[in-house]
Swiss-Prot record:
Listed Gene3D superfamilies: 1.10.8.60, P-loop containing nucleotide triphosphate hydrolases
Family of this protein: Belongs to the AAA ATPase family.
Gene Ontology CC entries for this record: chloroplast; plastid membrane
Membrane topology of this protein: Multi-pass membrane protein
Official protein name in the record: ATP-dependent zinc metalloprotease FtsH homolog
Domain notes per entry: Lacks the zinc protease domain of other FtsH proteins. Also much longer in both the N- and C-termini.
Chain ranges passing through the membrane: 87-107, 674-694
Localization terms from the record: Plastid membrane
InterPro entries assigned: AAA+_ATPase (IPR003593), ATPase_AAA_core (IPR003959), ATPase_AAA_CS (IPR003960), P-loop_NTPase (IPR027417)
Length: 1460
């Protein structure tokens, strides 16, 4: 007998490696697509496929869940991920599905290169594997008949063990275990992992001893040598035999095959793959001289597997395949091009491959052309999904069949119509009741709904379906023969009917013959015969039906109806309920079965005896089946193959049996082929790869996987009671309402100030770690020194020694913690960090009263809370986290307690029996006690349950309760009393320095520009939470990667805009064609610049930036900024508050300086003016800064300061107010006091007359620009076109205005007190007095005190508004050139930043306003130099050396006095 040879491949050439790399990446991408498909099917409600498939591969869970060597992994799952095997079971649903799909791909491609290639050349890749399974069976049975005869029983019992309901069958598994050589010694496969291990440790097969074997079967045993020197010494006589026959193995008791450690030399980058080639003998058949079927003996060692081994296994599997269709990529040695750009420009080969894969799999591109110099081919949609057809007709048939089959997948008629799609026969679908109804008739169901189906209707509306009896709803099927509509009762879909699958005729037809089957009788089989057989056993079938209301029926479009009619296809125009989940006919996960229960099948198996034709239950096993085409050449081969298949019988267990009326068990024949063994090995290989990859990536995507697994478990509640027995009990816990069960991989390293967190939370962490060792909860002394806790204690042993050394042996529970702070401040992240540091799981309980949960039933909230505590105690120690604590334990209302409750309410809430209005009659107010009495009391069950659970915490099962809320005032006081959630940690928004630290903390991974103004960034991020800053830096990193830059100022501003949700849609609203659009832009620019510059000129904190176009901010950021401004104004003085009031009117003052006409003023700044009005209300009413301490409380000090001559006769007697009554005439004659403080001026009337004379003589136009300024030459000239707007018909206003020629005073200026006095005159009625005394007035003319209070209140408010606005205009006009310069910069750049403003202060001689120059330079000069200034009188100040006022105008007083 020939021996096997071990060939070590040499290093391949560069071209060959490139080919292999491309092939590897293409297949890897195909597996990725399959993985996505598996995820969609796994997390879809249609997971019935996975459940059934899970039954079939029960043995597979035996390896994962029942192996003793995997206990460490199970423990790690429990502590770090999720409860025990929940993740593993849910993961198997996906991995097995993907593994089988991928194995079917490899299975096809391997046999394409073998002897079966002559058959495969005539087939299409899309075609079902099982439609040509006979070819594979023929090859395998011919090569290894002895193997199948001997091992058929073991494989069959493996798939369908006797104890079918259990998760494992240890006996059968032991027979397949390679370590039990004495029980299972027919064949031993090779583990591919040892091919990559160290050569010195492992020995391969010895050729000499292989030749000396006397047994026919080839046995390959891996042996681990204890001494490496024995391996090196090839001629050593002590070297044990690696190959033994059956007798020697059974007789030698001392020989033990050890486990193999997966070792690999990480230093070797370019690793050579080993090829093991064997010659074909009577017992083994190796395809393409390479091993493909591998049985992984050491699957439990995947915990130690490395990433390089995973890649090596993939290479071993993938490189043994020669693709047929994908070979188009391998043959093109020339560099590929994508849309005309060669991919060779990318130097890195891995980047090049990933770039190619990403471009080819982009589904957004409908058409992608990939060209090469050697060959040109065209892909429609994605190249990985497309195929190349030489024949256009064949391509059309394939594309049509693919679209039509995808449509039929979503319908319950998938199995019923696949046999008639390409059939020439026209026949109609018959039902159990053959009663026909004319189209004009009207039918009614049980609910009384009328269904009209005439020629104008194509479908049955959803509303007309009887939900109580959906299977009894009438339907319609289109008949091609008679071209009319007929009514039939729908099928009873509780069990699947027998349907003949004749296959697709045009796919496998030969060139000369049109018939697909040899015998024409097959096509003549109608469904009526099958339905009659179905009727006999469906009556007593008690399989429950699970219906999903969201999946009722389907609809045909009219265009599809025409296409089907033209192609002579049956069109089911019905709306049917889906009573069972759909299953794929072409899926390779089902084994091939042959029907033997009907006489019609005798044409397929003519050589079978009739006594072997037992009835089969199709609902359990016959999900996918096929029939083999007959031909003259292969007729004898198939008959012999089928005869060999039907030898062994298997009896199903009681749990999965459906009974006939006579109660006999159903029996069937099970067929085993070489494909089963290959499928088993390939599944194990892919399971090894995927589990290893998930183990490596568990720290980064572990939480996402867990959440997806819980979604899978949530959908499993739709399964029937029969299927629930196959799943663990915790899948169906009621209620399962907590959000997720996890232990986070977060730690204190995720925080910037980790030392402070450790100082506070180390006692909790250490106490929880101590309880994990199943010991008693340690004593925690409150009186510990603070110095001990300042440094984090890393080991709980040290903590134990410190704590237990105290004499006070009092046990103290871990008290609950309440975290309070705004959203995004890291409350939930801190909980995960505590869990990660303590290495314990976390249960997050989220209150949602409207959530039905997984059970689809409304469960009381307090019951969910009780279940959560029970579950937490079962896995203690753990953390039970309550997010949004205010919704779980809201404050109770409905009454107050105590004897003096009403007095306390009245004093605290200022409740009066009546409410006074200043200008209205007294109106009664409702008593608030009535509201308290009528207020409904909310259910308190959840709150009481929480209080009960908090009081019953014990040391035996320690649970750390942590709550989080941003509204502490809404929580019931009983929850936060001492002993419960008494430990409160407040989280606040970061300040400016902390925001800078957060930005630098989250900027790791991408370098930063050195010239970033961090003070500017800190001001722009006012009100940002740490989560907002994290998102900001992520957006900045993405912007930098896409633009190939670092973290720059532009990238950070882009991130800020993304966080705030700023959009540039404002430009689309502007109509450029309008004449006043430029004027509108200028108004907006002046307003924003004035609002920004005025704080700088008052030496206050200015805004960080302004944008030309309006932007929107998130509500939470606005709220945080408003709260910060309110809190900062609580302790300000009156001067500071008045300054803030003036700053509110800076924008409107700058706009008035630009345009004085009322018709040109815009509505810009409404929010600021409203805020100023609110601020004045606080000053006058809340802070009471402008009222005296007299009993009346209405005499403002502002009036006394502004017009002292008016109030000189005032007395404090309340009934002597003659002067007040006659006061308005004296107000007009009071001396005028302006902003310059000029006293002794002329009266108001004289000034008014002179002003009229001046206005009549002078031009009526308002102020105009005298000349262009010096800084005009530094900005584009096009910008100043918007300044050429007409200034005609502008009149003087009553506000203070500067004169173009720098005059000191404008005669038209009207003081604020005089302007408001007119309001007083209109509000106060006229009083008439006699010399004898007062006369009683009527009610209409009677003045009450609230009216006088209102008049004076309005006077104060108006004075503050006008005075603030005039002061803002005066200050901005003094620096008008700098204002215009900033406006020009804003219009040009569309943004004006604080650093840009500060840089230009020196050019305008405004260095004193720089924030760093807090003190003026004049204060440090000598007194002698200061005296010189007294000799001069400054007329006008200097505007800077570059301005049109480079030097100040002054008068030498000494010179004038000397001349006099």
């Amino acid at each position: 007998m020939n021996t096997s040879n071990l060939d070590i491949t040499k290093k391949s050439s560069v071209n060959q490696r490139n080919k292999e790399r491309i092939t590897y990446l293409m297949i890897k991408q195909k597996i990725k697509l399959l993985w996505n498909k598996a995820q969609m099917d796994a997390f879809n409600s249609n997971n019935y496929i996975i459940i059934k498939f899970f039954k079939k591969y029960t043995y597979f869970l035996n390896l994962i869940l029942k192996d003793n060597d995997i206990n460490s992994y199970r423990t790690q799952l429990k502590t770090s991920f999720i409860l025990n095997s929940k993740l593993t079971i849910s993961l198997l649903f996906i991995l097995i599905f993907v593994g089988v799909e991928a194995s079917s791909i490899l299975f096809k491609e391997i046999y394409n290169q073998r002897a079966a290639s002559k058959y495969f050349k005539k087939l299409n890749i899309q075609f079902n594997n099982f439609q040509y399974i006979g070819y594979i069976n023929h090859l395998t049975y011919k090569s290894v008949p002895s193997f199948l005869n001997k091992e058929q029983r073991i494989i069959s019992e493996l798939f369908f063990p006797k104890k079918y309901g259990a998760f494992s069958n240890k006996k059968i598994w032991d027979e397949l275990n390679c370590y039990k050589i004495n029980k299972f010694n027919e064949y031993i496969t090779i583990d591919p992992l040892w091919l990559f291990s160290n050569k010195k440790k492992y020995n391969l097969i010895n050729k000499k001893k292989l030749n000396s074997l006397s047994n026919k079967t080839t046995k390959i045993i891996l042996y681990e040598s204890e001494n490496e020197e024995e391996v090196n010494d090839k001629n050593s006589k002590e070297n044990k035999s690696l190959l033994m026959d059956e007798k020697s193995i059974s007789s030698s008791n001392n020989i033990k095959v050890k486990r193999f450690d997966l070792l690999i030399d990480s230093e070797k980058k370019d690793r050579q793959l080993l090829k093991v080639s064997f010659q074909k003998d009577d017992n083994f058949s190796f395809i393409n001289n390479k091993i493909f079927g591998y049985y992984y003996q050491q699957l439990n060692n995947y915990l130690n597997i490395k990433k390089e081994i995973i890649l090596a296994i993939e290479k071993l599997i993938f490189y043994s395949i020669k693709k047929k269709k994908v070979n188009l990529w391998v043959k093109n040695e020339a560099p590929l091009e994508y849309q005309g750009q060669p991919l060779k420009l990318i130097n890195n080969r891995s980047l090049k491959a990933s770039y190619l894969i990403n471009k080819l799999t982009d589904r957004s591109n409908e058409k992608i052309a990939v060209t090469s110099k050697q060959n040109k081919f065209y892909f429609k949609k994605s190249p990985l999904e497309a195929q190349r057809f030489k024949n256009k007709k064949k391509f059309f048939i394939a594309s049509f069949w693919q679209r039509f089959r995808s449509f039929l997948k979503e319908t319950p008629y998938y199995f019923d119509y696949t046999n008639r799609i390409f059939s020439k026969k026209k026949f109609e679908l018959l039902s159990l009741n053959k009663k026909k109804i004319s189209p004009k008739d009207q039918t009614q169901n049980q609910e009384g709904y009328s269904i009209y189906l005439d020629k104008s209707h194509d479908i049955i509306p959803f509303e007309q379906i009887n939900l109580n009896n959906p299977l009894g709803t009438k339907g319609v099927i289109y008949n091609i023969k008679s071209n009319n509509k007929k009514y039939y009762n729908l099928f009873n879909y509780r069990s699947r009917p027998f349907v003949i699958h004749a296959g697709i005729k045009k796919y496998l037809r030969r060139k000369k013959k049109n018939s697909y089957f040899r015998r024409r009788k097959i096509n003549n089989i109608s469904s009526n015969t099958l339905l009659k057989l179905k009727k006999s056993y469906t009556q007593n079938l008690k399989m429950p039906v699970f219906l999903n209301p969201n999946q009722w029926g389907f609809y045909y479009s009219k265009s599809l109806k025409k296409n089907i009619k033209n192609r002579e296809l049956i069109s089911p125009l019905v709306n049917l309920p889906i009573a069972h989940q759909r299953e794929y006919l072409y899926n390779s996960k089902y084994l091939p079965f042959v029907f033997t229960n009907l006489e019609n099948y005798n044409v397929y198996l003519p050589n079978l005896n009739k006594n072997l034709q037992n009835k089969v239950n199709s609902d359990i096993l016959l999900k996918s089946y096929t029939y083999l085409p007959k031909s003259v050449k292969n007729k004898k081969k198939y008959t012999s193959v089928f005869f060999n298949l039907l030898k062994q019988k298997i009896i199903l267990p009681d749990k999965l049996i459906n009974y006939y009326q006579d109660g006999n068990y159903l029996k069937f024949y099970f067929f085993v082929s070489w494909f089963l063994l290959i499928e088993l090995f390939s599944i194990l290989a892919f399971m090894q790869i995927f589990i290893s990859i998930f183990y490596i990536l568990r720290k980064s995507i572990g939480e996402i996987i867990i959440e997806l697994m819980h979604e899978v478990s949530g959908h499993l509640n739709n399964v029937t009671e029969d299927l629930k027995s196959w799943l663990p009990e915790y899948f169906f816990k009621e209620p399962f309402e907590w959000q997720f069960f996890e232990a986070s991989t977060k730690s204190f390293e995720n925080f910037a100030e980790k030392e402070n967190l450790k100082r506070f939370f180390d006692p909790y962490i250490l106490a929880l770690q101590y309880t994990k060792s199943n010991l008693r909860l340690p004593f925690f002394n409150i009186k510990l020194d603070i110095n001990i806790l300042q440094k984090p204690i890393k080991s709980y042993k040290k903590f134990k020694s410190i704590v237990l050394s105290n004499n006070e042996k009092e046990e103290l529970l871990i008290k609950p913690i309440l975290l309070v702070g705004p959203p995004g401040t890291g409350k939930t992240l801190l909980v995960r960090a505590i869990a990660g540091e303590a290495d314990i799981p976390v249960i997050q309980f989220i209150v949602n009263k409207d959530s039905p949960g997984f059970t689809r039933e409304l469960v009381p909230e307090y019951e969910k809370l009780s279940k959560a505590f029970e579950y937490a105690k079962s896995i203690a120690p753990c953390i039970l986290f309550f997010d949004e604590m205010d919704s779980l334990a809201p404050k109770r209302g409905g009454g107050y307690f105590g004897e003096n409750a009403w007095a306390e309410i009245r004093l605290n809430n200022n409740i009066l029996p009546y409410e006074f209005s200043p200008l209205k009659a007294p109106e009664p107010q409702k008593n608030k006690m009535d509201k308290f009495k009528t207020k409904k009391v909310k259910p308190r069950g959840t709150l009481l349950q929480l209080l009960y659970e908090c009081n019953n915490l014990s040391n035996e099962k320690p649970i750390l309760l942590i709550g989080a809320t941003n509204r502490q005032n809404e929580i019931d006081p009983a929850v936060i009393r001492p002993g419960r959630f008494s430990t409160i940690y407040n989280f606040s928004l970061p300040n400016s320095s902390e925001r800078i630290d957060f930005c630098k903390f989250y900027a790791a991974g991408l370098s930063m520009d050195k010239e970033i103004p961090w003070d500017y960034i800190a001001k722009r991020t006012v009100g940002f939470s740490p989560s907002d800053i994290s998102m900001l830096m992520k957006e900045s990193s993405l912007y930098g990667v896409l633009n190939n830059t670092k973290h720059t100022l532009k990238s950070l501003e882009h991130g800020i805009d993304r966080v705030l949700g700023v959009s540039k849609s404002y430009l689309s609203t502007l109509n450029i064609s309008k004449k006043n659009v430029y004027n509108k832009i200028l108004h907006m620019a002046y307003y924003k610049v004035g609002l920004t510059l005025l704080p700088l000129l008052f030496k206050q904190e200015m805004p960080a930036f302004i944008k030309l176009w309006p932007m929107q901010e998130r509500a939470i950021v606005k709220q945080n900024k408003l709260e910060e401004n309110i809190h900062s104004s609580e302790w300000d003085t009156l001067a500071t508050l008045e300054q803030k009031l003036i700053l509110r009117y800076g924008g409107k003052a700058a706009e008035l300086l630009f345009s004085y006409l009322d018709k040109d003023l815009s509505d810009e700044g409404f929010s600021e003016l409203s805020a100023g009005q609110l601020f004045i209300t606080f000053l006058v009413d809340y802070y009471n800064h402008y009222s005296r301490s007299e009993p009346l409380g209405i005499i403002p000090t502002l009036l006394k300061k502004r017009s002292s001559t008016f109030w000189h006769n005032y007395e404090y007697n309340l009934f002597e107010f003659k002067n007040i009554i006659n006061g308005p005439s004296n107000v007009y004659k009071e001396p005028l006091i302006g902003f310059y403080g000029i006293e002794g001026a002329e009266s108001f009337y004289d000034q008014k007359d002179k002003a009229k004379d001046i206005l009549d003589i002078k031009d009526k136009h308002a102020q105009s620009l005298n000349s262009y300024l010096w800084w005009y030459q530094y900005v584009p000239k096009d910008i100043f076109k918007i300044w050429t707007t007409s200034l005609k018909n502008q009149k003087w206003s009553r506000f203070w205005l500067p004169d173009p020629e720098l005059s000191f005073f404008n005669l038209d200026f009207v003081n604020a007190e005089i302007y408001v006095s007119e309001l007083i005159d209109t509000l106060l009625p006229t009083w008439k007095f006699n010399n004898q005394g007062l006369r009683k007035l009527n009610k209409k003319t009677r003045t009450v005190w609230p009216q006088i209070k209102f008049a004076t209140h309005e006077y104060i408010v108006s004075c503050l508004i006008l005075s603030s606005l005039n002061k803002a205009m005066e200050v901005l006009d003094e620096h008008r050139e700098f204002l215009d310069f900033c406006v020009a910069h804003l219009i040009k750049e569309e943004i004006l930043r604080e650093p840009d403003i500060l840089k230009n202060l020196k050019r305008f001689n405004l260095e004193k306003y720089h924030p760093k120059n807090n003190l003026e330079k004049d204060q440090f000069k000598d007194n002698k130099k200061l005296n010189i200034l007294n000799k001069y009188t400054i007329v006008s100040r200097s505007g800077g050396l570059n301005s049109r006022r480079p030097f100040p105008l002054w008068i030498d007083v000494d010179t004038i006095t000397k001349n006099n």
